[in-house]
């Protein structure tokens, strides 16, 4: 049986109720052969917690965002999420970077 990571599953994470942005990113995911597990709108305090849930369970290969600041306005929280994702081999790919993996500076 094929494990879930081999199915190219991704998660979409967008700020607020940006339905048009979410639709655009979802279209990119489908065009790239990825299955969208969930689209999370960062409208409440549990949004980042749900993002961490998916990362920790290794059920996705990447998180698609417009920009990493959609995850949080707090730099420490962004770094924590990106570090967790890296530890699990999951990339956070930003539309603003042409869907290339976002990089984190440890300065």
What function would you assign to each model-found segment?
Residues 1-107:
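Short, structured surface patches at the beginning of a domain
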């Amino acid at each position: 049986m094929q494990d879930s990571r081999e199915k190219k599953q991704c998660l979409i994470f967008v700020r607020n109720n940006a339905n048009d942005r979410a639709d655009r990113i979802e279209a990119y995911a489908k065009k790239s052969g990825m299955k969208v597990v969930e689209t999370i709108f960062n409208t409440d305090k549990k949004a980042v917690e749900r993002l961490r849930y998916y990362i920790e369970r290794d059920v996705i290969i990447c998180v698609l965002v417009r920009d990493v600041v959609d995850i949080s306005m707090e730099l420490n929280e962004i770094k924590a999420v990106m570090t967790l994702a890296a530890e699990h081999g999951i990339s956070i790919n930003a539309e603003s970077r042409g869907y290339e993996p976002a990089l984190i500076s440890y300065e």
